[in-house]
């Protein structure tokens, strides 16, 4: 099985190996998905810049892919990673650090 990219982008939920903490949500197009498989590092598609980006390329906070899980509809993916440094550009471990309730 492989992701269905018929709509162009799929959500990629990134979780930390071991803790299973949700680190971030980003989007992949087919090219980002293929580069992730090839390099075993996370690649995403930036909707604002309309280009590919490699997590940690400039910050050094890289993500090493341990496993990938495809959902039942083949239109979203969970990326299980070994995270180096914080995942969030703010310096927080995870992008999900604002508690609402």
Curated annotation (Swiss-Prot):
Q: Give the species this sequence originates from.
A: Bacillus cereus (strain ATCC 14579 / DSM 31 / CCUG 7414 / JCM 2152 / NBRC 15305 / NCIMB 9373 / NCTC 2599 / NRRL B-3711)
Q: Describe its partners and assembly state.
A: Homodimer.
Q: What SUPFAM superfamilies does this protein map onto?
A: HisI-like (SSF141734)
User: What gene name is given for the protein in this entry?
Assistant: hisI
Q: State the protein's name.
A: Phosphoribosyl-AMP cyclohydrolase
GO annotation terms (biological process):
L-histidine biosynthetic process
A Pfam entry, by short name: PRA-CH
**Major location category of this protein:** cytoplasm
UniProt keyword Cytoplasm, yes or no: yes
């Amino acid at each position: 099985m492989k992701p269905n990219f018929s709509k162009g982008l799929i959500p990629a939920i990134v979780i930390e190996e071991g803790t299973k903490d949700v680190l971030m949500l980003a989007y992949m197009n087919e090219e980002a998905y293929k580069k992730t498989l090839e390099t075993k590092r996370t690649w995403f598609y930036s909707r604002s810049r309309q280009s590919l980006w490699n997590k940690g390329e400039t910050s050094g906070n890289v993500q090493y892919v341990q496993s990938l899980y495809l959902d039942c509809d083949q239109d979203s993916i969970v990326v299980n990673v070994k995270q180096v440094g914080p995942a969030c550009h703010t310096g927080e471990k995870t992008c999900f650090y604002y508690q609402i309730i």
